[in-house]
């Protein structure tokens, strides 16, 4: 049963009666006193809101309503007190489906003809559709424009593909006003006016005579950049925009900025100064010889190798021996006379060699001393007064006499009084002999290839302890005897470091001497 609400007026005092039906056997009639209703009902609009065309009007259909919440009313309710509440389920702005064909406003072309959309006699709507009444596709316009779709679009006289103005009318409007909407060239415009002249973007470039000459942006000489930056422009250094137009479609291109692509100054070689008088000849060349240990011997106060103030300094690398021998020759005469008054004790062979060398010291001393090469620790070049022993041949000073004797034997006389007991090699200095004897190695063991029958019988040959050669023995000793042999062998090796005789044969000695580095005789 459809339920109905009652709208009450403000000044009405309703009366409620319960009238029992005749079918029921009730023997009393109940009567309720009237009650004043102080509340007012909400006014409800009686007209229907806008809705979708095909959508029905829904009414509220309550399924269950409690009788205690209902206001009792008289059974014969008047007709004017029966309004119906209508609820709209859909909003009018959301009734458009996603698959509907919507058309927005057309994009106008670059046309020189200016006309208003209100000039059309049948124009009565906004360009942008606001509802779905006129959302029908324009089949007639599409068929007429499809013929010129594949035209030559590169020509400036071709019509634009986007119409300048589209009237949102039904399809019947195009059949009635077909002569008004479309012209002979399929460009929508007014019928009495000619086709609109479309502006070609390629003709929008400004000619070169419209503006004065601009400065060039290309890389050039430094003098040209100075003139350009100062404002002294020459017509020969400018560019014409008309020359660049065919290759670049009317848009001029710019060359790189100042000196950004110059390859001369960014090459792998060292950059040279070209704008000053400083040449490469007057600059100092730092080579590997400039950072040698020769510079460490110079003291800032007593250095004899002070740089000259000549115009050009010769930077050729000088041999270390020649640079050390050069100042010594100039001081030879003074040092030779001063060393004669000092007491010296020389051997007989050293005195004879020095007397024979002093007879022609002024004539042949320079080539002989320059050719010799000094070995060992480098001596200081400063003249120390504490060094009282001076060599008469090369004016070298020493603090001890044995150092001076060693100097004569190693450099001047080439006397070799020290001989190796192992190989018989002679040396002029005792320290060289002791260093040589370490190479023999008194405790070295000569290893040989053993056969399979030797592996079972191994022992150390006791008489040949000096040579230390491992040889097989007839019977193998026990553990205690083998330990005693090893202990005695180690003690013998430690005691015979320099006094042991060589146990090598001649072939081993010759092969060892070939490996040694020989001194220049």
Swiss-Prot record:
Residues 347-358, 494-505 have a biased composition (Low complexity). Phosphorylation by PKA leads to cytoplasmic localization. GO terms for cellular component: chromatin; cytoplasm; nucleus. Pfam families: zf-C2H2. Disruption phenotype: Strongly affects the production and secretion of liamocins. SUPFAM superfamilies: beta-beta-alpha zinc fingers (SSF57667). Its main location: nucleus. Residues 336-346 have a biased composition (Polar residues). Residues 312-383, 494-521 are annotated as: Disordered. Transmembrane segments: none annotated. A zinc finger (C2H2-type) spans 389-412, 418-440. It is found in: Nucleus; Cytoplasm. Keywords: Cytoplasm, Metal-binding, Nucleus, Repeat, Transcription, Transcription regulation, Zinc, Zinc-finger. Transcription factor that controls expression of the genes involved in the biosynthesis of liamocins, glycolipids (also called heavy oils) composed of a single mannitol or arabitol headgroup linked to either three, four or even six 3,5-dihydroxydecanoic ester tail-groups. Targeted genes include the liamocins biosynthetic cluster genes PKS1, EST1 and GAL1, as well as related genes such as the ABC-type transporter encoding gene MDR1. PANTHER family: MIP31509P, TRANSCRIPTION FACTOR WITH C2H2 AND ZN(2)-CYS(6) DNA BINDING DOMAIN (EUROFUNG). This is C2H2 finger domain transcription factor MSN2. It comes from Aureobasidium melanogenum. The lineage of its organism: Eukaryota, Fungi, Dikarya, Ascomycota, Pezizomycotina. The gene is MSN2.
């Amino acid at each position: 049963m459809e339920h109905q609400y009652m709208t009450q007026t403000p000044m009405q005092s309703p009366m409620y009666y319960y009238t029992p039906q005749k079918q029921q056997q009730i023997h009393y009639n109940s009567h309720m006193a009237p009650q004043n209703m102080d509340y007012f009902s909400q006014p409800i609009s009686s007209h229907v809101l806008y809705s979708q065309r095909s959508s029905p009007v829904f009414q509220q259909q309550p399924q269950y309503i409690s009788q205690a919440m209902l206001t009792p009313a008289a059974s014969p309710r008047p007709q004017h007190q029966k309004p119906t509440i209508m609820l709209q389920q859909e909003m009018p702005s959301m009734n458009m489906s996603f698959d509907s064909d919507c058309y927005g406003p057309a994009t106008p072309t670059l046309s020189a003809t200016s006309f208003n959309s209100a000039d059309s006699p049948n124009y009565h709507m906004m360009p942008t559709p606001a509802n779905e009444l006129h959302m029908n596709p324009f089949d007639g316009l599409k068929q007429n424009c499809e013929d010129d779709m594949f035209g030559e679009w590169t020509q400036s006289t071709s019509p634009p593909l986007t119409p300048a103005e589209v009237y949102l009318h039904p399809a019947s409007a195009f059949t009635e006003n077909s002569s008004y909407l479309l012209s002979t060239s399929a460009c929508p415009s007014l019928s009495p006016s000619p086709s609109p002249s479309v502006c070609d973007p390629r003709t929008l470039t400004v000619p070169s005579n419209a503006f004065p000459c601009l400065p060039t942006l290309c890389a050039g000489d430094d003098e040209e950049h100075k003139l350009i930056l100062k404002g002294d422009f020459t017509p020969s250094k400018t560019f014409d925009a008309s020359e660049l137009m065919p290759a670049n479609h009317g848009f001029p291109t710019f060359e790189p900025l100042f000196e950004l692509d110059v390859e001369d100054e960014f090459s792998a070689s060292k950059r040279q100064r070209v704008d000053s008088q400083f040449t490469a000849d007057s600059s100092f060349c730092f080579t590997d010889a400039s950072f040698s240990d020769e510079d460490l011997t110079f003291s800032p106060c007593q250095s004899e190798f002070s740089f000259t103030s000549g115009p050009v300094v010769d930077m050729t690398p000088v041999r270390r021996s020649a640079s050390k021998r050069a100042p010594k020759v100039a001081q030879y005469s003074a040092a030779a006379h001063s060393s004669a008054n000092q007491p010296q004790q020389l051997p007989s062979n050293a005195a004879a060699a020095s007397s024979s060398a002093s007879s022609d010291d002024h004539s042949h001393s320079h080539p002989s001393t320059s050719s010799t090469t000094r070995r060992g620790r480098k001596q200081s070049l400063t003249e120390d007064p504490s060094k009282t022993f001076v060599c008469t041949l090369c004016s070298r000073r020493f603090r001890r006499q044995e150092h001076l004797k060693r100097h004569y034997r190693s450099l001047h006389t080439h006397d070799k009084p020290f001989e190796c007991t192992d190989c018989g090699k002679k040396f002029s200095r005792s320290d060289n002999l002791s260093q040589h004897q370490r190479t023999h190695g008194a405790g070295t063991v000569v290893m040989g290839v053993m056969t399979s029958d030797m592996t079972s019988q191994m022992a150390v040959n006791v008489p040949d302890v000096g040579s230390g050669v491992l040889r097989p023995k007839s019977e193998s000793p026990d553990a205690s005897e083998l330990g005693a042999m090893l202990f005695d062998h180690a003690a013998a090796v430690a005691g015979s470091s320099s006094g042991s005789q060589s146990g090598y044969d001649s072939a081993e000695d010759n092969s060892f001497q070939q490996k040694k580095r020989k001194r220049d005789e």
